[in-house]
Amino acid sequence: MIVNPFRALVSRLNKSRPRSEPARHARRAFQKRSRFSFSLTVLVLTLVFLFLPLFVIVVYSFNANKGSDFTGVSLVWYKALLFDSKNLWRSLFNSLLIAFSSAAVSTVLGTLAALGISWYKFKGKTYIQTISFLPMVLPEVIIGVSTVIFFSGIKLPLGLFSIFAAHTTFCLPFVFLMILARIDEFDFSIVEAAYDLGATERQAMLKVIVPAILPGILSGFLMAVTMSLEDFVITFFVSGPGSTTLPLYVYSMIRFGVSPVINALSFVMILGTVLITFSMRKFLKNFAAAK
């Protein structure tokens, strides 16, 4: 008989727990004291560390003064963002265009690759999954240098397409691994049941497999969009004239001082990210309830 080591460990720990009433009270008192003295402190400090810089950006986006002294509330920087920032909007458009296009391609390729790895058995399957981790552990400088050398070798001009190709290659392993983790939880006997009921391979794919792994596909797509939008190092190496993205544009502005217009744009992007996140969460919740 095969024994689950984790289940055996849990059973052993349960047996080793003190059963007396004083021991239970002592354990609960210790957990309560440690929870509020250490865990809560760490949680609060972590949240402050994460969200305080964002709060500062939001506050200074409404500052009437260009400097660090807060002199009053004003919407002047949002007006400048809307009407006097053509280059900034162009760089944002380039970033969004590259992010969504590279995320779409990497999601399609990653989904097909994950399905192929899970469905078929062949030699070297384990090595492919291991190699997929390399872009996650390699420094982006190495990836950027190797990518620009490869593009130079094949005579590919640097521009928006080179950034798109580099971001697709960089995001593909992340999407592949996220979808693969979702597929590993899928029961393929459902597909066999669909075949027995007369479904074709296309119907089984579109009506059984894809709906089951849709949360993983959407998560991989959003991860790819986020990674593409925030990437600076790889984009710095493979960009060319007329292909400035938002991170490159912000970097060029920081060299001459941070403009409050960037703060206004940051708040708009934070607000958009929050709305997309909650909308996606509600969609996945309704999708799970519908199933």
Regions found by a protein language model. Name each.
Residues 1-28, 38-41, 124, 180-191, ...:
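C-terminal transmembrane helix and the adjacent membrane-cytosol boundary/short C-terminal tail
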Residues 23-25, 29, 67-68, 75, ...:
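Membrane-interfacial helix termini and adjacent extracytoplasmic/periplasmic loops
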Residues 30-35, 78-87, 228-281, 291:
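Interhelical loop and adjacent transmembrane-helix boundary motif
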Residues 36-43, 112-147, 191:
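Cytoplasmic-entry segments and transmembrane alpha-helices of multi-pass inner-membrane transporters
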Residues 49-54, 176-180, 186-188, 201-230:
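Transmembrane alpha-helices
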Residues 57-65, 175, 217-251:
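Non-cytoplasmic
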Residues 62, 86-119:
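Transmembrane alpha-helix signature in integral membrane proteins
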Residues 87-94, 152-172, 216, 221, ...:
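Loop-to-helix entry region at the N-terminal start of transmembrane alpha-helices
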